Amino acid sequence: MGKHHQNLLNNLEELRKLAGLTQQDLSESAEVSRKSINAIENGIYVPSTVLALKIAKTLKCNVEDLFKLP
């Protein structure tokens, strides 16, 4: 599992790269800033449910593939 916040593990960076997307590409699709995507990838920020769903839709995966409880 990739980076983690104390309450959430995430695979966002790995799955984003597998999809061939940059942070900027993903941020535009999810309608957030590139800095927000970076903060999520580095475990600094936990996304809202809506944002997590937008990211999963863009990456064509389930939210559970992206984020897990420790």
Q: Language model features by range: what are they?
A:
Residues 21-39:
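Short alpha-helical DNA-recognition segment
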Residues 1-2, 67-70:
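Short, charged recognition helix plus adjacent turn
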Residues 1-18:
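A short, Lys/Arg-rich alpha-helix, primarily the initiator
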Residues 10, 21, 47-50:
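Residue-level signal for the short linker/turn that defines the boundary of a DNA-recognition helix
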Residues 17, 28, 57:
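Alpha-helical residues within the helix-turn-helix
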Residues 42:
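Short, conserved catalytic or interaction motifs in soluble domains
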Residues 50-65:
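DNA major-groove recognition helix of helix-turn-helix/homeodomain DNA-binding modules
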